[in-house]
């Protein structure tokens, strides 16, 4: 994504993520991620509050925590399946998790 003009570049990183909703957890996967937010793919539409918690589970790393807000959502199609996608802007990421996230983004850009 070299031509991107974003303040925080995105990296194509696929991590398991759990979206914590008031109706319980919804599991999904990141499609890309930056220091400012992420694109999440889920098999179902999460029932979200204004701000919600995210638990990222990258392989070989500790879990990362964040709080976010949904900026957009859509139902998308790939070759065989429909899935729910949502763009999330982070509203809070603990300092240590920001550092780990930044290292992961640098490794993949």
Regions found by a protein language model. Give the residues of each.
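N-terminal helix initiation/capping motif
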Residues: 1-35, 102-109
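A structural micro-motif recognizing beta-strand termini
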Residues: 42-44, 91
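Short, well-ordered loop/turn sites that connect or cap secondary structure elements
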Residues: 11, 46-48
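Short conserved beta-strand and strand-loop elements enriched in small hydrophobics
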Residues: 15-19, 49-64
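Hydrophobic core residues within well-ordered beta-strands of beta-rich domains
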Residues: 13, 26, 52, 64-66, ...
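C-terminal output/interaction extensions
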Residues: 3, 13, 78-109
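Conserved hydrophobic positions within beta-strands
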Residues: 30, 68-70
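Short, conserved beta-turn/loop elements at beta-strand boundaries and strand-helix junctions
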Residues: 22, 35, 73-79, 95
């Amino acid at each position: 994504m070299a031509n991107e003009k974003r303040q925080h570049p995105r990296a194509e990183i696929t991590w398991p993520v759990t979206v914590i909703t008031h109706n319980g957890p919804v599991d999904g996967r990141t499609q890309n991620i930056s220091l400012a937010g992420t694109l999440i793919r889920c098999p179902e539409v999460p029932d979200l509050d204004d701000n919600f918690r995210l638990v990222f589970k990258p392989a070989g790393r500790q879990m990362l925590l964040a709080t976010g807000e949904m900026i957009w959502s859509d139902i998308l199609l790939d070759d065989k399946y429909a899935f729910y996608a949502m763009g999330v802007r982070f509203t809070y990421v603990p300092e240590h998790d920001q550092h780990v996230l930044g290292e992961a983004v640098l490794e993949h850009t």
